[in-house]
Swiss-Prot record:
Organism encoding this protein: Nitrosomonas europaea (strain ATCC 19718 / CIP 103999 / KCTC 2705 / NBRC 14298)
Pathway(s): Glycan metabolism; osmoregulated periplasmic glucan (OPG) biosynthesis
HAMAP family: MdoG_OpgG
Gene name as annotated: opgG
Name listed for the protein in its UniProt record: Glucans biosynthesis protein G
GO biological process, one term: beta-glucan biosynthetic process
Length: 518
């Protein structure tokens, strides 16, 4: 329905008055509650689709052209101030065609950071300065001397919808986080909320953290977010969110992570490729409320696959990149071996719900085809506030992301099952073999003759033909070999396995889904 111009003016006059009241207070009083008031106001009104003001030369450009538009590093925000952080901005272009408002919060005021084309070097992109002078930014990035005290490196990028990416020391960008996911993988189609406005607190010279506030908006939800960014060897952000639904949603994804898995050791490439593995993440890790650790290796299935792990008050979950030897990837350009894992640690009790994993078929590495989030069993009524707090850590230290007394899966290898004959020649027997290597800080200290055994199971669509365990001296762990026979290849097959020593559980649970048509 088209709104009359005067109605729109009156509505935004009310928002302007609200903003004036908010900004009248000093910076130390600015909080997530100020942003929440705006989110509540938006939730009480009908959604207005943001309008693009982008000239066609920018809207229709290809990725290579967009890459030519580079921020002028000499004009980084706070460049002339003694702060540990600097800001740079993204220009609009391609599908980044809607401006976001970016504000600076100081000790005495809140003011908008104005767009100017002078911030950017446009390369060979022809443009009229008069048509771009009031465009606004597509997003921003944060810089910090995380690798060297004399050089500022990018540590955070906020660009597109509610996506953001972070990296710690020695890491390169890989998977992304999001503010909120709505109706992911449902037949009705996914809704992508977007951060429409940011408030960034100017850091003091001695600050080791940066505080960012964000206002989220979408047709059926609004939200207020507070991010406390803490860069180090790993980078950590404390997230606080206040979410308000405008209308009913089918599925609400809290603390969503988005990644890519094309092929790997458990799901080899269908074509010959010099890279043995190609992925930003290779598994979903879950620390359930009952203490169980679960590892689900990722797949690139031929059909959409949705897995749900019921867990009340989860202790943590994340999409991890396990196994960082360069030889596993052999990619000098994209350095998948340096891409971080992302781990969510909930704060407080989230209640009853599930960690959900969505695997989407893809033919190339440019498509993010993996999504993971926690979704509550019961959704709130429209307008009612729901709160979630959690810590998000991006790390290359997989030992740090797992309990020291619980062994974890280092790798899952898949092979054609076979039997060694009396003449020592291996003969395929129609089975599929999985070789799973377990290791861990406590497991490495176990004597080699420890009687480690496996507890393994498979659903009604398969039979376990072999389950054997042997010590692996290379990793100071144990290797489990499973050979399984699938009854109907057009159906999904579920398997589970863990290592034990008598009644003592030694490892996490390997929870594998063999996709249909494999």
């Amino acid at each position: 329905m088209r709104h009359k111009p005067q109605i729109i003016k009156m509505r935004w006059l009310g928002v302007a008055v609200t903003l004036l009241v908010l900004y009248a207070s000093s910076a130390w009083a600015f909080s997530i509650n100020d942003v929440a008031k705006q989110a509540q106001l938006l939730a009480s009104e009908s959604y207005e689709t943001p309008e693009t003001n982008l000239p066609s030369i920018f809207r229709d450009m290809k990725y290579a052209d967009y890459q030519q538009i580079q921020f002028n590093h000499d004009k980084a925000y706070w460049n002339n101030l003694k702060t540990p952080f600097k800001l740079e901005f993204y220009h609009q272009g391609m599908y980044f065609d809607t401006p976001v408002k970016i504000n600076e919060v100081t000790a005495t005021s809140v003011h908008q950071i104005k767009y100017t084309p002078d911030y950017f070097n446009f390369g060979n992109v022809q443009h009229d300065k008069d048509t771009v002078k009031d465009l606004g930014f597509a997003g921003f990035k944060v810089l910090n001397p995380i690798n060297s005290k004399n050089k500022n490196d990018e540590i955070l990028s906020m660009l597109g919808a509610s996506y953001f990416r972070m990296i710690g020391a020695g890491q390169v960008y890989g998977l992304s986080a999001r503010g909120l996911a709505i109706d992911t993988a449902l037949p009705s189609g996914e809704e992508f909320p977007r951060f429409r406005e940011f408030w960034i607190e100017r850091p003091k010279p001695a600050d080791r953290h940066l505080i960012i506030y964000a206002l989220l908006d979408s047709p059926r939800a609004t939200g207020a977010y507070r991010f406390v960014i803490m860069p180090n060897r790993d980078i950590t952000v404390n997230v606080q969110s206040k979410i308000y639904l405008r209308d009913k949603v089918g599925k609400l994804g809290i603390a969503p992570l988005t990644s890519m898995f094309l092929f790997g050791s458990n799901h080899p490439s269908p074509m010959v490729n010099f890279r043995p593995e190609l992925h930003d993440s290779n598994g979903l890790s879950i620390h359930a409320s009952n203490g169980e650790w679960i590892w689900r290796p990722l797949n690139n299935p031929r059909r959409l696959a949705i897995s749900s792990f019921s867990t009340e008050n989860p202790q943590g979950f994340g999409l991890l990149q396990r196994g960082r030897q360069f030889s596993r990837f052999e990619d000098l350009d994209d350095r998948y071996d340096l891409r971080p894992s992302a781990w969510i640690t909930p704060k407080g009790k989230w209640g009853k719900g599930s960690v959900e994993l969505i695997e989407i078929p893809t033919n190339d590495e440019t498509n993010d085809n993996i999504v993971a989030f926690w979704t509550p069993d019961q959704l709130p009524e429209a307008g009612k506030e729901i709160n979630f707090k959690y810590t998000l850590t991006f790390s290359k230290d997989e030992d740090k992301l797992h309990a020291p007394d619980n062994a974890y899966v280092m790798q899952t290898l898949r092979s054609t099952g076979d039997v060694k004959q009396s003449n020592l020649i291996r003969q395929p027997d129609g089975t599929i073999a999985f070789i799973i290597d377990f290791t861990g800080r406590k497991m490495k200290k176990l004597p080699q003759d420890t009687p480690v055994a496996a507890q393994a199971s498979i659903d009604d669509n398969g039979t376990i033909v072999e389950s054997s365990v042997r010590y692996n001296p290379i990793i100071k762990g144990w290797r489990l070999t499973l050979r399984v026979k699938v009854k109907d290849v057009e159906k999904i097959t579920e398997m589970r396995a863990a290592l034990v020593n008598g009644d003592q559980i030694l490892s996490e649970t390997w929870s594998y889904q063999l996709p249909a048509d494999e």
